[in-house]
Regions:
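Bacterial N-terminal signal peptides
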Residues: 5-15
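Aromatic-lined, polymer-binding surfaces characteristic
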Residues: 435-438, 446, 476, 480-503, ...
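Aromatic- and Gly/Pro-enriched helix-to-coil junctions and flexible linker segments
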Residues: 20-354, 361-365, 369-384, 388, ...
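Sequence context surrounding c-type heme c attachment/ligation sites in exported
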Residues: 20-98, 766-921, 925-929, 935, ...
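Secretory-pathway/luminal and periplasmic proteins that interact with or process carbohydrate-rich
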Residues: 48, 82, 105-106, 456-460, ...
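Core structural elements
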Residues: 448-454, 486-497, 585-600, 946-950
Length: 994
C-alpha cells in the first residue's frame, strides 16, 4: 500500500483549505523523481498517453491541474511506473504525496481524482487486500456528517405519507396494503430517479440541481392544492376547524349556483309569466343545416363536390355535450314536429342561457345531421317532460335575486353571475366578522402541518418564525391562500428532500459523535425500507432506547423479521401480485441492483429470433427472477453461494406450490376426460353434450358455434402436454393463477430455458432443478441484461464479473477506440470478438474481461443454453418458419451453425486452487462461489449500498466484521446487514472539511 493511497483512502474524505490560485511549482526533489522514473516516456521526446512532465512548471494553470490529477490517479492505482519497471520507494512516494497536496493548495483547487473516488464507478480503487488483511483495522471508522439527497423510492413513500395514499392489492385471496407504489390521483413528478445500470445506484454525493428544484416547485403547488381539499383537511383537525365555515359556504354557494343553472329558465317563466319574453335577449339563430349526404348515406358531400366518410352516431356524438342535447329534446319534443322546429327550440334555450357559441354550434351541428338516430336510440316520447313544481319557501331566495338583478336583454348566465357574486360577498363578510385567527390557533396549524409534511414537531424557534409568516400570509391572502402558501413553503424546505445525518452530543476521543436518536431512526428505517420510521422505532426514540449499539441491533433485527408489510418490487411489471414481496424491500433491492438483471427489459429483442412474443413475457421472466432471489434470501443460508450456484429456478410459476399443483391436476383431468373421445371430429352439437365439464373445468364458456375450431386446437395442445404420462404445465387452466388470483400468463418464458412443451415434465413444486444452469449468472434475465440486441456480449459479462465479484478495475475505453465488432457471417461472435480485441493495444484491458465472458458463450443472447451458434444471415438461412403460431411452437428460422467454444480463464481470486482455465460458465461460477475474494467483494458492495458511499481504509474493521458475521452465521445476509448497521462506520458521524 503506497503512502499516496493511504493519505487519500485512509482518511474518509480528503480535502483542503483553499488559498488564492497560484501556478504549480516543481522543486528539485520532485523533478529528480520525474527524471528518474517518468520522463523517458513522458518527457520532451516522448509523449505517451498525451502526458509530458519535463516542463510542467511552465504550463498554463488548467493544464497543470489536469496533469496533477493524472499523476495522482496513476500513483494511486499503481499503474505507473509499469509493473516491470523500477518502483518508487516509500520516501519518494511520500515526497510526491506531499507535493501534490501542496500544489492543490497553491492552485486553490480540490483534487478531481479524489472527487472521483467518491463515485460508484471508483469504489474498487481502494486496495482489496488492504481492506481485509487487518493491517488497517485499528483505524477508527465513521461516516462524515452529511446532508443526503433522498432517492426516488423514499420520495414516493414521502408523497404517499403526506397525501395519506394507501394502495392495496390482492395477495393470496386477501387485500394487503402495499408500499412503493406511485399510482395516485395526483400529478406529482419524481425528480430523484436513480441512474440505470448494475451496481449500487444511490450515493450520498448527488447534488440538488435546477431540474430537481423546478420539479419540486411544481410538486409543492400540486401538493398544497391537494391537501386543501375538504377530505384531506378533515384529517388535519386544526386546519379543518379554521376552514370549516368557509368550506360550508363553498358548498352552499355551489348548491345555489347549480340550482340556478338547472332551473333558471322555469323560475323566470314562473316569476314573469307572459312578460318573460319581453326580458329575453333577441334570439340570433346559427341557421345550421344538415350537410348533404350521398345516396347510399355513407358520405358527406362537401360544397366543392368532394366526398368524405360520414362517421357513425357513436363516433360523431360530442361526449361532453350529449347530455345537454338529450335534456333539451325531452323538454321540447312533441308529436308531428319537424326536426328543424325541435332544433330551433333547443338552440333558443341555450342562446338565452348564454351558452357559448362554440358549444351551441357543436350541439346543433350534431342534431341536424343525426336527429333521426338520436330520436331512435333514446326513444323520446311527447309529454315526457314534467315541469318542476317549486315550493315557495325553497325558491324565495332565488326569486329575490332574479328580481333584483335581471335587466332586459340579460342572458341567464349574467343573472346567475350577479346573484353568485352577491352571495359570495355576503359569505366573506360573515367570515370577516368573526375576527382574525388567534395565536394559539395558528400555532396548532403550524404544529399540524409540520407533522404532516415534515414528519416532526417544530421547535420553539420555528414556531415563532412561522407564526409571523402565517400572520403575514393570512392578513394579505386570506385563510385558504395563506394555508396553501404555507404548505408550499414547507414542501420546499430542504429537509423535505434531504436526509440529515449529523453527529450529535459529545464527541469521543477521535472526534466522532453518534447521531441523534431521531436522525438514527430515519437512517435505520431508510436502510431497510424506504419509509419513515415505524411506530416501534418511534417508541424507541421517545423512550430513550436508541442510543447504543445494542439498541440499533435490536431494532434492525426486528425490522428485518417483519413480514406484515408488502412492497411493490418494480412498477414496470404491472398489477400482478407476483410483483410483491414482504421481504424488507432494500434487502431484495440490493441484489437486484448488484446483479443488474432488472435492466434487461430495456434491451430490444426480436420476437422472431426468440420464437415467441418477447414483450408479452419479458416482465413475467423478471418477476420469476425476483421470486428466485427472494426465495434464496428468505432462506438466509449460504446466500451468496446459493445465488451463484443454485440449479433451481422458477419457470411459469406463481410461487404458490399448492395452487400450481391444483392447476396442473385440473389439466390432467381434462386430458383424462377427452383422451378416448373423437374430439377431432366433434361438431358444435357434439361439444354441447359435454358443456358442463367444458365450462366447469375452464376449457371454454361455450358461447357459440364459432368456438369449435378453438376447442379442437385447445384440445390438441392438451393432448400434446400430457404425452408420455408427464406432469402437464397448467397454461390456460382457470386454476393457473397469479398470487392476485388473476390468470397466470407467460407460458412462453419456457422458451428461454430450452424447454420443449411436448417433453416438459412440469414441476409443480418450485424452484426446481434445471439442467445446464447454475445461479443468477445463468438465468436468462441476467444473461440478457448483459447482451446486445442481437448477440451476446462477453465483454460486458466479463467486466461485470471482474468489477462486482473480483473487486477489480477496468480502465475507461480510450476516446480514440471505436469499439465495434466487425461483421462476418461465416464466424461465431466469439471468433469475431477475438479478432478485434486480442491485438496488443486492446488486450491490455480486454484480458481482464474476455476470458471471463467467453465462458458464457454456452448461452445465446436470450439466455438459452446452446452447443452451436446460429450464423444469422440471409446467406446462411436453411429453413424459413412461420412468423406467427401458438404459444407452444418454436417459430425461429433455421440457419447454418458453428460449434460454440466455451472455455475461458479465471484470474483474480488470488487463490491458486481456483484461478486457471475453466470449461464453461458452470465451471466458472462454481469456482467463484468458493472464492474468499468474491464473498468479500459482495460485502464491499453491500457496504456501499447500506452506507451510501465508497469504503475507505478506516472502514477496514467494519468490512472484516461483516465478512466474519456472514461466515459465523452460516451465510446469513441478515447477519451482514446487522453487522454493517451496527458498525462504527454507520453509527458514528464526524465533521470533515469540504
Amino acid at each position: 500500500m503506497n503512502i499516496l493511497k493511504l493519505s487519500i483512502a485512509g482518511l474518509s474524505i480528503f480535502s483542503f483549505t483553499l488559498t488564492a490560485g497560484q501556478k504549480v511549482t516543481v522543486p528539485a526533489s520532485v523533478q529528480g523523481i520525474f527524471e528518474k522514473y517518468c520522463t523517458d516516456c513522458h518527457g520532451a521526446k516522448k509523449k505517451k498517453g498525451d502526458l509530458q512532465l519535463h516542463d510542467i512548471a511552465n504550463l498554463e494553470k488548467d493544464f497543470q491541474s489536469n496533469i496533477l490529477n493524472k499523476i495522482e490517479e496513476q500513483l494511486f492505482i499503481e499503474e505507473m511506473p509499469p509493473k516491470d519497471e523500477e518502483q518508487l520507494s516509500e520516501n519518494e512516494l511520500s515526497i510526491l504525496s506531499e507535493w501534490i497536496e501542496n500544489q492543490y493548495k497553491r492552485m486553490g483547487e480540490n483534487s478531481k481524482f479524489q472527487a472521483k473516488l467518491k463515485t460508484p464507478d471508483f469504489g474498487n480503487y481502494v486496495n482489496h487486500e488492504d481492506l481485509f488483511s487487518g493491517k488497517y483495522k485499528d483505524l477508527k471508522g465513521f461516516t462524515p456528517d452529511r446532508r443526503w439527497l433522498i432517492n426516488e423510492f423514499i420520495f414516493t413513500e414521502k408523497i404517499n405519507q403526506v397525501t395519506n395514499t394507501r394502495q392495496q392489492r390482492n395477495r393470496d385471496g386477501k387485500r394487503v396494503n402495499i408500499h412503493n407504489s406511485s399510482k395516485r390521483n395526483l400529478n406529482i413528478t419524481n425528480p430523484f430517479l436513480l441512474p440505470s445500470g448494475s451496481g449500487v445506484r444511490y450515493y450520498d454525493n448527488t447534488m440538488l440541481n435546477g431540474g430537481h428544484l423546478l420539479s419540486m416547485i411544481s410538486n409543492a403547488k400540486e401538493l398544497s392544492k391537494y391537501l386543501m381539499n375538504e377530505r384531506q383537511m378533515s384529517s388535519m383537525a386544526p386546519v379543518y376547524k379554521v376552514m370549516k365555515l368557509e368550506l360550508d359556504h363553498d358548498k352552499e354557494l355551489e348548491k345555489r349556483q347549480r340550482f340556478l343553472h338547472e332551473n333558471i329558465h322555469e323560475l323566470m317563466q314562473e316569476i314573469y309569466g307572459e312578460k318573460n319574453k319581453d326580458y329575453l335577449p333577441e334570439f340570433i339563430s346559427l341557421n345550421m343545416e344538415a350537410t348533404p349526404v350521398s345516396p347510399d348515406g355513407n358520405s358527406y358531400i362537401l360544397p366543392d363536390g368532394r366526398k368524405v366518410k360520414k362517421s357513425n352516431h357513436d363516433v360523431a356524438a360530442p361526449k361532453g355535450e350529449y347530455p345537454y342535447i338529450k335534456t333539451a329534446i325531452v323538454k321540447y319534443y312533441v308529436k308531428d314536429q319537424t326536426s328543424a322546429e325541435l332544433v330551433r327550440l333547443c338552440e333558443k334555450e341555450w342562446y338565452e342561457k348564454g351558452t357559448g357559441k362554440l358549444k351551441i354550434s357543436t350541439r346543433v351541428g350534431f342534431m341536424v345531421n343525426y336527429m333521426s338516430e338520436i330520436l331512435r336510440r333514446n326513444k323520446f316520447k311527447p309529454g315526457q317532460f314534467k315541469p318542476k313544481v317549486f315550493k315557495e319557501d325553497d325558491i324565495k331566495l332565488y326569486k329575490e335575486m332574479i328580481l333584483k338583478h335581471r335587466q332586459k336583454g340579460d342572458f341567464h348566465n349574467a343573472v346567475i353571475k350577479k346573484s353568485v357574486d352577491e352571495w359570495q360577498a355576503g359569505f366573506e363578510a360573515e367570515r370577516k366578522a368573526l375576527g382574525e385567527l388567534k395565536e394559539p390557533e395558528i400555532i396548532e396549524i403550524i404544529n399540524c402541518l409540520f407533522q404532516r409534511i415534515l414528519d416532526r414537531e417544530p421547535n420553539d424557534g420555528e414556531i415563532q418564525e412561522h407564526l409571523s409568516l402565517m400572520q403575514s400570509y393570512i392578513s394579505t391572502l386570506g385563510r385558504r391562500e395563506a394555508l396553501t402558501k404555507f404548505i408550499e413553503t414547507l414542501v420546499l424546505r430542504s429537509e423535505f428532500v434531504y436526509r440529515y445525518e449529523f453527529g450529535d452530543g459529545k464527541a469521543d476521543e477521535h472526534g466522532r459523535k453518534m447521531m441523534s436518536p431521531e436522525a438514527a431512526a430515519y437512517a435505520l428505517a431508510y436502510a431497510i425500507n424506504d419509509s419513515a420510521p415505524d411506530e416501534e422505532l418511534r417508541k424507541a426514540v421517545k423512550n430513550g432506547k436508541l442510543n447504543t449499539r445494542e439498541d440499533y441491533k435490536r431494532e434492525i433485527e426486528r425490522m428485518l423479521k417483519r413480514r406484515d408489510l408488502y412492497y411493490l418490487i418494480d412498477e414496470r411489471v404491472g398489477q400482478n401480485a407476483d410483483g410483491l414481496t414482504n421481504t424488507p424491500i432494500r434487502k431484495l433491492r440490493f441484489f437486484r441492483e448488484f446483479f443488474g438483471y432488472p435492466n434487461f427489459p430495456e434491451i430490444f429483442k426480436d420476437n422472431k429470433r426468440l420464437g415467441a412474443s418477447y414483450d408479452r413475457i419479458k416482465f413475467r421472466l423478471l418477476e420469476e427472477c425476483d421470486q428466485l432471489v427472494d426465495y434464496i434470501i428468505s432462506k438466509d443460508k449460504n446466500v451468496f453461494e446459493e445465488l451463484l450456484t443454485s440449479d433451481r429456478y422458477y419457470v411459469y410459476h406463481s410461487g404458490d406450490n399448492e395452487q400450481m399443483k391444483k392447476a396442473s391436476d385440473d389439466i390432467k383431468k381434462q386430458y383424462e376426460y377427452f383422451k378416448d373421445l373423437d374430439w377431432q371430429n366433434f361438431t358444435y352439437e357434439d361439444f354441447m353434450k359435454h358443456k358442463d365439464f367444458i365450462v366447469e373445468s375452464g376449457i371454454s364458456h361455450m358461447r357459440g358455434k364459432g368456438e369449435v375450431k378453438w376447442l379442437q386446437r385447445s384440445l390438441g395442445e392438451l393432448m400434446m402436454r400430457n404425452k408420455n404420462g408427464k406432469t402437464p404445465d397448467p397454461f390456460k387452466s382457470k386454476l393457473a393463477q397469479s398470487r392476485a388470483k388473476t390468470r397466470l400468463d407467460g407460458i412462453s418464458i419456457a422458451h428461454f430455458f430450452n424447454i420443449k412443451f411436448d417433453e416438459w415434465d412440469y414441476p409443480v413444486t418450485q424452484p426446481a432443478a434445471l439442467p445446464n444452469r447454475k445461479g443468477i449468472l445463468s438465468h436468462p434475465a441476467w444473461l440478457m441484461a448483459f447482451s446486445q440486441n442481437t448477440h451476446t456480449d462477453p465483454v460486458l459479462r466479463g467486466k461485470w464479473i471482474r468489477e462486482k465479484l473480483l473487486a477489480g478495475t477496468i480502465p475507461d475505453v480510450p476516446i480514440t477506440v471505436e469499439a465495434v465488432v466487425p461483421e462476418d457471417h461465416h464466424k461465431t461472435f466469439r471468433a469475431r470478438l477475438e479478432d478485434v480485441t486480442e491485438v496488443k493495444y486492446c488486450w491490455k484491458c480486454h484480458k481482464l474481461m474476455n476470458p471471463l465472458g467467453y465462458a458464457f458463450e454456452m448461452f445465446d443472447d436470450f439466455g438459452r443454453y446452446r452447443t452451436e451458434e446460429a450464423l444469422e444471415h440471409p446467406d446462411n438461412l436453411l429453413k424459413k418458419n412461420p412468423d406467427k403460431g401458438t404459444e407452444y411452437e418454436d417459430l425461429r428460422d433455421i440457419f447454418k451453425t458453428q460449434p460454440v467454444i466455451t472455455n475461458g480463464h479465471l484470474k483474480g481470486t488470488e487463490d491458486d486452487k481456483l484461478d486457471g482455465d475453466v470449461k464453461n460458465a458452470l465451471d466458472l461460477v462454481e469456482r467463484l462461489a468458493k472464492s474468499e475474494r468474491v464473498r468479500q467483494s459482495i460485502i464491499r458492495h453491500a457496504f456501499r449500498y447500506f452506507m451510501g458511499r465508497n469504503e475507505v481504509l478506516s472502514d477496514s474493521k467494519t468490512l472484516i466484521d461483516a465478512d466474519q458475521a456472514y461466515l459465523k452465521s452460516g451465510g446469513s445476509f441478515d447477519a451482514v446487514i446487522v453487522s454493517l448497521l451496527t458498525s462504527d462506520s454507520f453509527i458514528y458521524r464526524k465533521a470533515v472539511k469540504e
